[in-house]
């Protein structure tokens, strides 16, 4: 149980779009705690196995997309709730990779960048400008780009600490 919980928390920490895994895990554990008969235990175990297999699918999806965990997190934020054609999906992948590379070159390396208003504004503006200039229209409208800008910025704020450190390691 502790191993799975640790793996789920790590996954959610690295990519907030995987929070559904954690919710499903909690539901399974609650279900287990409600009943202790053999049928409930077997069903709970089956669901736990299914959940662990879905972790593997998420990891395989990351590899299949040709992205790192940190790139996939941005990619997932940008594509969440969208039905994208392959061409658009590839554009979103490219945007995710290039935006992250650009920010990691300088802005995210500033110690405690999120606490410094000028640097934080520069990060936000880079995200906003990049998304407004590159996300495919009409698939992404102005209000959606505003939302995605805020989601990406919040993700960066919580995952990148500055000084070349992030939840993904040193960069």
At which residue positions do the language-model features occur?
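Catalytic cores and motor modules of nucleic-acid processing enzymes
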Residues: 1-171
